[in-house]
UniProtKB/Swiss-Prot annotation:
ATP binds at residues 33-40. Residues 292-363 form the Mop domain. It comes from Vibrio vulnificus (strain YJ016). InterPro entries: AAA+_ATPase, ABC_transporter-like_ATP-bd, ABC_transporter-like_CS, Mo/tungstate-bd_C_term_dom, ModC_ABC_ATP-bd, Molybdenum_import_ModC, Mop_domain, P-loop_NTPase. One of its GO terms (cellular component) is plasma membrane. It catalyses: molybdate(out) + ATP + H2O = molybdate(in) + ADP + phosphate + H(+). Part of the ABC transporter complex ModABC involved in molybdenum import. Responsible for energy coupling to the transport system. This is Molybdenum import ATP-binding protein ModC. SUPFAM superfamilies: MOP-like (SSF50331), P-loop containing nucleoside triphosphate hydrolases (SSF52540).
Amino acid sequence: MKGLQVAFKQTLGHVVFDIELQLPSKGVSAIFGRSGAGKTSIINVISGLTQPEQGRIALNSDVLFDSVLGINVPVHQRNIGYVFQDSRLFPHYHVEGNLKYGVKQYDAEMFDKVVALLALQPLLKRYPASLSGGEKQRVAIGRALLSSPKILLMDEPLASLDMPRKKEVLPFLEKLSESFEIPIVYVTHSLQEILRLADHLTVLDRGQIVASGVLSEVWSSQAMRPWQSFSEQSTLFNANIAEQHPQYALTRVMLSSTASLWVQKIDAPLGSDIRLQVRANDVSITLVQPQKTSIRNIIEAKVERVEKRHPAEDKESIAVKLALTQDCFLWATITPWALADLNLKQGDRVFAQIKGVSVTQRDIALTH
């Protein structure tokens, strides 16, 4: 079977793990959850740093652990790259020495590829003490890649960095899955990192899998509600760039074969695939098509579902799921007053309104 299969049972402290997980054979699979949910424990089991009481771990056709068959491949033979929260560089080696440390068979072409991908050339003769946090993490990622791993495990690699350093490293992480066709398992507690990087999402809570699947589906599921506040609820779209406005700094993206959206200008070629977030708070609903309005996006839709939500004991909001096409949906958040005034019900034809300026660069990621 292709991909990464993780199945194990284990008790660690107060957390009882019962994991059954199938992850894709390439791309970025994010593991998300609150502190103490067991995210790092899962990748430690995959790497062999932790041995479960029972279970099976397999990568494609390679069985790494099987408690029934008595298989437990040692850590150093699993051919796994691991990037920790802290870079763990050797202080007495310069960057080039750190990159080459542990490389079984030096490959000059691969070395040049990794150095170019992570923009490490200016750093090669410098020592870790002179590097910024972001530079150290880029070196750590490079070292892991140069071990020619069959899978890359990343344990919150940006958690120790401040915001400017995170912004420095994120573009390099975005290139990883395009440049190396290996599965990348990425542990994080950051919704922004998931938006920018992930193709697949697993939500974990106290050692149990709450949801796992394609990012756009899990993102809109009940499993994500505890982490999405009233203002953070949103819809994710896999879209592509269709048009650059000839006069204004706006880009039209296709959400489906017929539904499109004008957003702030995206500097990428026509046809580029992107991931795009539309916040439910930025979507309003009208029963008739407006005329002479400043809102650039007016999309005909059908009411698919109406849900009452309680972000706090004394607060209530209404989530409306709108069908733009048969398999393309958009969430809108409105007030109970608006619901009563519009008398919305399933099957109603309406118009969704989204400001062109509401979708910004932080809501968009190129997916190559």
